[in-house]
């Protein structure tokens, strides 16, 4: 099934506490709590969630958010139209490199999650359109692994400027001009989310994506190694399961693939300078659960139970905004 102990708990006990929900699934972070006071006009007059079913509440909260989201998108589109009109009227349209992208994707209810900060497809993948008819053939589609660190080098390259050696990314100008992936181009994309359980109850995680598979490691702690959630691994076959509904990490048929992706992930972390040396307390947790043997899994189960107790105590005390990204909390996990 989808997810892991990191996103569901040992026996699904953490489903109410991981990730912002549309309806009331997550009692700390959900749009049914947050949106009615902010946008009362998007809900029925004198709205009280107690008078509606969970299904209706979820629908109302989801639609309220989606309307706001799409209005933002429409605002961007309208202003892009103004810009393009100006470029056309001044004769600069075909002499201008237009790059349309975003800093990340966005969850709009998939897995009952909202916002970004996940390595799942809807959040990790970004829109990327490039127009420059002088050298890019209209309708060109490339399927190369491109990351946001590649944007800067590409812009400099297209402007005829030298790309500094200090920049991590590589120019994909040749991809755009030829429609083909150059030999030796990277075959993976790297992902890291570190603000553990801060804005939308997202556990800290790191991972790697190829064109066909994705490996996610939820190490589940802040930079001080504290506020732990259960560590867990997830593997998805994007060619057969594009919506990431079946975690294949424990499937024996994928053991060799898991080992290879872990090797690539470790190498990538070193290559990009995210090897954990700057935050040794967090890296200690990362390494502790890297192999994920029986002992690791048993400890993850205990962490899941301990986190549930902590979260329930916080909710009972009326604490919604907990300082999760810093500090270390002592735990009672036996060695």
Task: Show the residue positions of the predicted features.
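Short amphipathic alpha-helical coiled-coil/interface segments
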Residues: 261-265
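Carboxylate-dense, calcium-coordinating segments in secreted/extracellular and ER-lumen proteins
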Residues: 244-248
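Charge-rich, acidic-biased intrinsically disordered regions
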Residues: 99, 282-297
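Short beta-strand segments enriched in hydrophobic/aromatic residues
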Residues: 102, 132, 219, 280-281
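C-terminal cap/loop subdomain of S1 sulfatases and analogous C-terminal strand-loop tails that border
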Residues: 104-110, 149-152, 157-234, 238, ...
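Active-site-proximal cap/lid insertion segments
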Residues: 1-146, 158-166, 224-232, 253-256, ...
């Amino acid at each position: 099934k989808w997810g892991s102990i990191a996103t569901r708990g040992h026996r699904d006990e953490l489903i109410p506490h991981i990730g912002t929900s549309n309806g009331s699934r997550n009692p700390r972070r959900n749009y049914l709590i947050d949106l009615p006071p902010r946008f009362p006009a998007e809900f029925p007059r004198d709205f009280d969630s107690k008078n509606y079913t969970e299904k209706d509440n979820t629908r109302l909260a989801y639609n309220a958010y989606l309307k706001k989201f799409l209005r933002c998108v429409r605002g961007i589109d309208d202003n892009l139209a103004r810009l393009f009109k100006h470029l056309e009227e001044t004769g600069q349209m075909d002499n201008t490199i237009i790059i349309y992208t975003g800093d990340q994707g966005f969850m709009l209810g998939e897995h009952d999650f909202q916002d970004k900060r996940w390595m799942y497809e809807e959040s990790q993948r970004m829109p990327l359109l490039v127009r420059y008819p002088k050298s890019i053939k209209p309708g060109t589609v490339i399927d190369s692994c491109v990351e946001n660190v590649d944007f800067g080098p590409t812009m400099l390259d297209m402007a005829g400027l030298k790309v500094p050696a200090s920049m991590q990314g590589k120019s994909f100008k040749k991809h755009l001009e030829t429609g083909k992936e150059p030999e030796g181009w990277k075959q993976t994309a790297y992902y890291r989310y570190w603000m553990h359980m801060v804005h939308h109850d997202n556990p800290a995680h790191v991972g790697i994506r190829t064109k066909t598979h994705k490996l996610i490691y939820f190490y589940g702690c802040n930079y001080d190694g504290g506020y732990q959630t259960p560590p867990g691994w997830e593997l998805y076959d994007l060619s057969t399961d594009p919506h990431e509904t079946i975690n294949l990490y424990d499937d024996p048929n994928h053991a060799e693939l898991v080992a290879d992706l872990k090797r690539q992930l470790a190498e990538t972390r070193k290559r990009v300078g995210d090897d954990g040396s700057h935050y040794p307390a967090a890296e200690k947790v990362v390494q502790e659960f890297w192999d994920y043997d029986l002992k690791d899994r048993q400890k993850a189960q205990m962490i899941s139970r301990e986190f549930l107790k902590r979260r329930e105590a916080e909710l009972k005390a009326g604490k919604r905004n907990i300082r999760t990204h810093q500090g270390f909390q002592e735990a009672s996990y036996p060695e």
